[in-house]
């Protein structure tokens, strides 16, 4: 048997023996499935203003409206289903995380590789910038950047990129 296949089978045997790891993997794939297929899984579209009924505002969890739709987590002040809002919010969160992570990886890898290639004063300068940035708490720095730029998904992506690139450059 190929040593790589043997190693992979050994890993899977050890992994599948750990019940917590299997449960975490199942939850991960469930969240990923819900995020990717939210329009098909969610009961309603929270962004579709024609389906939102103000008469259904602030319903408690498990309530039904006049048409018989059950709101398992209730509704918000505008009458939107909270389960649907969570499912659609997962899509946005997953997109922000993946996109900002990939862009930060690209920028950080560029500066890290270029610093290693050119050496000397350029490497010292880039690594001091990285050291200065890594000396601040990431969440605090991201909140300061968002406070300076304003709120919004695009500003959040920019803040995450500006905070994360240094980890990849190091």
Show which residues each predicted segment covers.
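Generic hydrophobic transmembrane alpha-helix motif, especially the helices
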Residues: 72, 103-110, 116-170
């Amino acid at each position: 048997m190929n040593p790589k296949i043997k190693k992979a089978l050994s890993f899977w045997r050890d992994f599948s023996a750990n019940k917590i790891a299997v449960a975490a993997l199942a939850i991960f794939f469930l969240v990923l499935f819900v995020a990717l297929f939210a329009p098909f899984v969610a009961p309603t579209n929270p962004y579709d203003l024609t389906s939102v009924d103000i008469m259904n505002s602030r319903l408690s969890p498990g309530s039904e409206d006049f048409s018989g739709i059950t709101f398992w987590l209730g509704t918000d002040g505008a009458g939107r289903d909270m389960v649907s809002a969570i499912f659609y919010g997962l899509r946005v969160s997953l997109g922000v995380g993946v996109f900002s992570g990939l862009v930060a990886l690209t920028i950080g890898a560029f500066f890290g590789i270029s610093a290693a290639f050119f050496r000397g004063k350029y490497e010292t300068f880039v690594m001091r910038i990285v050291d200065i940035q890594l000396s601040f708490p990431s969440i605090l720095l991201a909140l300061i950047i968002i406070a300076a730029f304003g709120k919004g998904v695009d500003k959040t992506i920019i803040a995450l990129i500006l905070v994360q690139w240094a980890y990849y450059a190091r």
